[in-house]
Amino acid sequence: MSAITITDAAHDYLADLLSKQNTPGIGIRIFITQPGTQYAETCIAYCKPGEEKPDDTAVGLKSFTAYLDAVSVPFLEDALVDYATDRMGGQLTIKAPNAKVPMVNEDSPINERINYYLQTEINPGLASHGGQVSLVDVVDDGIAVLQFGGGCQGCGQADVTLKEGIERTLLERIPELKGVRDVTDHTQKENAYY
């Protein structure tokens, strides 16, 4: 299985859970909600026969079939499902390091590319000040409408960050973008960094 690894311990644990469902042919379905965003969540659910989606990738395992959601497959690359025993019994863990990483290229829609650079280049720097910026919209004239949050909302340096950091980076990476506009209410200063 190239996209995801299910350890023997996880397989045995899941097989035991599935056997208790009294449903012949039941398997699991692995998917990511909101893949490629900061809100991505990796999920495993029971999958009764007929509940799999036509475009799912079926992976036959020793005791059951795992169905991988087609949209989620690129985000499941290098994912690991494991089961570790502890004093309380044990815990199934899912580690999907690429779940929140947007998958974009130069042919991707402009909003996906903007979000990609915001998440991978801009927000990691803003996080050191407890802040973040998000895309609200791309208006017809090629302007990205952004909103600051956290420590950036109300910060006295937001204009400098917007023009010297964010706009410069986005214009270098996305040639058809014409500029950025801030719609943040900066009168709210209780969490401002500066």
Swiss-Prot record:
The record's remark on the cofactor is: Binds 1 [4Fe-4S] cluster per subunit. The cluster is presumably bound at the interface of two monomers.
SUPFAM superfamilies from the xrefs? Fe-S cluster assembly (FSCA) domain-like, HesB-like domain
Q: Which GO terms fall under biological process for this protein?
A: iron-sulfur cluster assembly; protein maturation
Which GO terms of the molecular function aspect are on file? 4 iron, 4 sulfur cluster binding; iron ion binding
Q: Which residues does the record give as [4Fe-4S] cluster binding sites?
A: C152, C155
Record's NCBIfam families?
A: YhgI_GntY
What is the name of the protein in this document?
A: Fe/S biogenesis protein NfuA
Q: What is the lineage of its organism?
A: Bacteria, Pseudomonadati, Pseudomonadota, Gammaproteobacteria, Pseudomonadales
Q: Which gene encodes it?
A: nfuA
